Amino acid sequence: MGVVTKEQDDLVIRLYIQPKASRDQIVGPHGDELKVAITAPPIDGKANAHLCKFLAKQFKTAKGNILIEKGELGRHKQIRVVMPKEIPEAISVLIP
């Protein structure tokens, strides 16, 4: 499985999360994952909630359409974006 996989209308993305960063951003490829930096600390699910909010803005979709499938408690995550309205350029170039 690559960094980004398209399944019907959804995208499945493997992420490496950098919490407590200076700003929210999609950094780029990181091995076989996509590195995403977020400002929230990894405490009490704050980083996951912030990640979902940030990605929802990037894909112009509702927060409920960003699902963490694997890695709820770690830096390595697999997320599903349900029917994104827009795909950020940093991610669209990684779609096979």
Curated annotation (Swiss-Prot):
SUPFAM superfamilies: YggU-like. GO terms for cellular component: cytoplasm. It comes from the Bacteria. It holds the Pfam family DUF167. Belongs to the UPF0235 family. This is UPF0235 protein Shew_1134. It comes from Shewanella loihica (strain ATCC BAA-1088 / PV-4).
